[in-house]
Swiss-Prot record:
Molecular function (Gene Ontology), one example: 4 iron, 4 sulfur cluster binding
Entry's family note: Belongs to the methylthiotransferase family. MiaB subfamily.
This protein's name: tRNA-2-methylthio-N(6)-dimethylallyladenosine synthase
Binding site for [4Fe-4S] cluster 2: C157, C161, C164
Named cofactor requirement(s): [4Fe-4S] cluster
Every TRAM domain range: 378-442
Main location: cytoplasm
InterPro entries membership: Elp3/MiaA/NifB-like_rSAM, Methylthiotransferase, Methylthiotransferase_CS, Methylthiotransferase_N, Methylthiotransferase_N_sf, MiaB_methiolase, rSAM, rSAM_horseshoe
GO cellular component: cytosol
One Pfam family of this chain: Radical_SAM
Quaternary structure and interacting proteins, as annotated: Monomer.
Taxonomic source organism: Pseudomonas paraeruginosa (strain DSM 24068 / PA7)
UniProt keyword annotations, A-Z: 4Fe-4S, Cytoplasm, Iron, Iron-sulfur, Metal-binding, S-adenosyl-L-methionine, Transferase, tRNA processing
Gene3D superfamilies named among the record's database cross-references: Methylthiotransferase, N-terminal domain, tm_1862 like domain
Length: 446
């Protein structure tokens, strides 16, 4: 009977990508088959996130739940990867001594030998080093599962924002070779992928070396990816305002495969707070980039990240954030109350803002952005939208779903699985709080 692999993933899309590559790697080297049931697994991997304190505590809570499985099956291998593993290293075993393997985001390619060593020696294996881009040279070609796929183009971040652990857990920025990225996209397209999402902690900071030794920037990469036969849509995340260049904006104007949606984190609308965060840009500079982007693509939708209650944030600072929210018209956000991360400069700042004030501000911010997003969705009612059909609806197996150019989920009545992977025109009938409902226009599939 085939041995089983269970992977649980916390955090960002980069972690989702890494988890898929772990499955590819262990499927090829150890013939492990992915299962959705941890209780039947021979190997359990937890791919972790350390961006917030609650996310980190969630790791040890989950490991505690798996301790009984280890007691029942001493041959079970439990591994912890991702950013908590990178940050904590061998210290993870002080709280969870039954963990066999600890690996970082840059060492996941060493999983087969680490698992083998843990089994043969009965000793824990820990490797959270930063061997730069080596992991991409050691990973098998990605498996295709549906019409969409993630492609990692660079790793790490060199911005060192005062609140962020990423440079310490994923290392400095390292771009994959340009030709390697294109080769992966071609492989995906040849196997039925029609939409790719290019990933990086600072994806628009990509500087990939070409076969002739030249460095190509992210705007050039987008244009070449768009030229790959079969690729009809391109998304990317996450961007940094500092490197949202005029060349990138021009690509949005000229490359039809780029969707009309961008995620561009700003964190705060206060220059004073941005300086304390070491974001190295002002609100005015951010607004200038948004103005140019909207001039290039008038109907583009923009989402962002916000941290509420950063140490020293005043009511005036928060009001400036709300002003920016309304001026830009963000329609979605990842927004959280500030959580001090050990080892970051911001962790040394006095955090004396009452918790109830932070919660109130977060509620106001999220409420306003949700309202703006819903208003955009309502304006889409009556329109016809081109969507890529990706799967059955999660709530109704009699419906299919896909995404619009501006990142709205659309559900429509149809139970024919052969539509999955095709583009279709859908008439939008109704706007719900988190999705749209529509009717398939017959004869529009392609």
């Amino acid at each position: 009977m085939a041995k089983k692999l269970f992977i649980e993933t916390h955090g960002c899309q980069m972690n989702e990508y890494d988890s898929s590559r772990m499955a590819d790697l262990l499927g090829e080297h150890q013939a492990l088959e992915v299962t959705e049931n941890a209780a039947e697994a021979d190997v359990i991997l937890l791919n972790t996130c350390s961006i917030r304190e609650k996310a980190q505590e969630k790791v040890f809570s989950k490991l505690g739940m798996w301790r009984d499985l280890k007691q029942q099956n001493p041959d079970l291998v439990i591994g912890v990867g991702g950013c908590v593993a990178s940050q904590e290293g061998a210290a993870i075993r002080e709280r969870a001594p039954y963990v066999d393997v600890v690996f970082g985001p840059q060492t996941l390619h060493r999983l087969p030998e680490m698992i083998d060593a843990a089994r043969s020696t009965r000793k824990p294996q820990v490797d959270v080093s930063f061997p730069e881009i080596e992991k991409f040279d050691r990973l098998p070609e990605p498996r295709v599962d549906g019409p969409t796929a993630f492609v990692s183009v660079m790793e790490g971040c060199s911005k060192y924002c005062s609140f962020c652990v990423v440079p310490y857990t994923r290392g400095e920025e390292v771009s994959r070779p340009f030709d390697d990225v294109i080769a992966e996209v071609i492989h995906l397209a040849e196997n039925g992928v029609r939409e790719v999402t290019l990933l990086g902690q600072n994806v628009n900071g990509f500087r990939g070396q070409t076969h002739d030794g030249r460095l190509a920037d992210f705007a050039e990469l987008l244009r070449v990816v768009a030229a790959v036969d079969g690729i009809e849509r391109i998304r990317y995340t996450t961007s940094h305002p500092l490197e949202f260049s005029d060349a990138l904006i021009q690509a949005h104007a000229e490359v039809p495969e780029l969707v009309k949606f961008i995620h561009l984190p700003v964190q705060s609308g206060s220059d004073r707070v941005l300086a304390a965060m070491k974001r190295n840009h002002t609100v005015l500079e951010y607004k200038s980039r948004i103005r140019k982007l909207k001039a290039a693509v008038p109907d583009i939708c923009i989402s962002s990240d916000f941290i509420v209650g950063f140490p020293g944030e005043t009511e005036k600072d928060f009001e400036q954030t709300m002003k920016l929210v309304e001026e830009v018209g963000f329609d979605f956000s990842f927004s959280f109350i500030y959580s001090a991360r050990p080892g970051t400069p911001a962790a040394d700042l006095a955090d004396d803002l009452p918790e109830e004030v932070k919660k109130r501000r977060l509620q106001i911010l999220q409420g306003r952005i949700h309202q703006q997003g819903y208003e955009i969705s309502r304006r889409m009612v009556g329109s016809t939208q081109r969507i890529l059909v990706t799967d059955f609806s999660k709530k109704d197996p009699g419906m299919l779903q896909g995404r619009t150019e501006n990142n709205r989920i659309v559900n429509f009545r149809c139970d024919n699985p052969r539509l999955i992977g095709q583009f279709a025109q859908v008439h939008i009938d109704d706007a719900l709080p988190h999705s749209l409902r529509g009717t398939l226009i017959e004869g529009t599939l392609h």
